[in-house]
Amino acid sequence: MEEVWELWTTKGGLEMWWGPEGFTTAVSKLDLRPGGEFEYAMTATSPDAVEAMKSAGLSLTSVARGRYAEITPRRRLAYVTVADFIPGVAPYEVAAVVEIHPASGGVRMVVTEDAMHDDLWTQRSMMGMNSSLDRLTKVLDARHGQRRAPR
């Protein structure tokens, strides 16, 4: 659980996997405490990601800002991000909770996110999170030289 916690809560950990496939992330601020702020830039780098961003009318790089709401080391991380990158939509907050549980032979993560302003953006958010979690699994697999069961 310590390793998964580190990947969720450190600059180096997040930069290894955060963001959908085809994106890189650069963390510029990470104050891991309740009320602490974080900020990162996520950039589309693969041809497919670049095309998807352009077709959605979005910048290739978006800066995300948020704050930590709750921190229970190695168990629970709650945070709020500001969705301020959507053309024609006023900024609003989106809450998320990550729960980390011991499981037979490993760790079980439960990630819960608020819905976004409409079904399309909620679906995009879910797809992005699922892709990010796939990348997290690959990081863990590479570290342990094994393949894990699908989520």
Predicted segment positions?
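A short, structured loop/turn motif at beta-sheet edges
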Residues: 1-2, 30-35, 69-76, 99-108, ...
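Hydrophobic ligand-binding cavity/cleft-lining segments
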Residues: 1-25, 29
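Hydrophobic pocket/interface hotspot
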Residues: 4, 14, 38-40, 68, ...
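Surface loops and adjacent helix of pleckstrin homology
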Residues: 19, 43, 82, 112, ...
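Glycine-rich portal/gate segments that line the openings of hydrophobic small-molecule binding cavities
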Residues: 26-82
